[in-house]
Amino acid sequence: MRILEEDLKNSTYRIRIESLDDLWYLRNILSEGDEVSAITFRRVEESADVQRSRERERIPITIRLKVEKIEFQDFDNRLRILGTVIEGPEDTKGKHQSITVTVDSEISITKEWDDQHIDLLKEATDEKYVTVYTAVAMDEDEAQIFLIHPYGIQQVGTVYSGRSGKYAEGNYSEASYFDQIVNALKNYSNSIIILGPGFARDRFARYCAQRGVNVIGSFPANRTDSGAVYEFITSADGAKLLSNERIARDKEIVDEFLVAVKKDMGVYGRDQTESALQMGALSDLIITDEMFRTEDGRRSLSIAQTVGTRIHIVSVSNDPGQIVKKFGGFAGILRYRVQ
């Protein structure tokens, strides 16, 4: 994400979306009641005869919406903002309209910016926080390919070696297997991490070096699925390599919370967490991105800011966020035990 213009007097930022991950940040920055301005398209009104003979032409218009709803699925390639037009061509004012945001879109946002929204904006525009890594979790039989986004893990492919199992082939070749993996990796990031048990991982790393593939590390893991990626994230090597990644920070704080619960130093659920907040007893508030966008979430964040509690927003697109979601979307680590 890039900030193109900053108008602090009017609480407005104009930004450009530069990657799919920016759409996740934008989803969490936007709230109902915000105002956004961007170019959208509408169909030219034509007579019924003309409509039957050809598809209606779409022309670009610039509109300003008051946000009512945001539609976005994780790892999707677009975000839709729906609302009422407050500025635009005369015949559009007061009508419902949508703006579709994709990579390379430019959009202006006017809102009441609190600290968390500003932090998200800064994180989205800082390259050290938004690196996407490619992980290959593999053994002699298969390789699963994952993208490690700042907010979650996305599986994007699987390559079978044909050595054994239902995909077994009589003409198995390890070189052919490795070549298929390398070809699959061409579509993704150059920052490649190889994970897995046994020696196939190391042989593949050497093969990549011979082919000029940019492998930044080969690390042991007990599995060849997404569990291998989470195992790596929690390892010392993963913590060092991914220290700036949101997903690694999510994992670290949720692990601390789980330890705190065992020691009777953790609370969870909206009511327990807010009660501890109001007493000033929470050192850390952990809230899912889903709850961050709710009135209850905003209230808890406001209290946390007032009493000096550290705030952590975790994504439900990854395992740590799913853990917090199962605890009701709100969790906290206590400064001291409460009754």
Swiss-Prot record:
Residues spanning the membrane: none
MF term (GO), any: metal ion binding
Database matches in InterPro entries: eFR1_2_sf, eRF1_1_Pelota, eRF1_3, Pelota/DOM34_N, Pelota_arc, Ribosomal_eL30-like_sf, Transl-rel_pelota
Cofactor(s) of this protein: a divalent metal cation
Broad class of enzyme this protein falls into: hydrolase
The entry's keywords: Cytoplasm, Endonuclease, Hydrolase, Metal-binding, Nuclease
SUPFAM superfamilies: Dom34/Pelota N-terminal domain-like, L30e-like, Translational machinery components
Subunit structure: Monomer.
UniProt name for this protein: Protein pelota homolog
Taxonomic lineage: Archaea, Methanobacteriati, Thermoplasmatota, Thermoplasmata, Thermoplasmatales
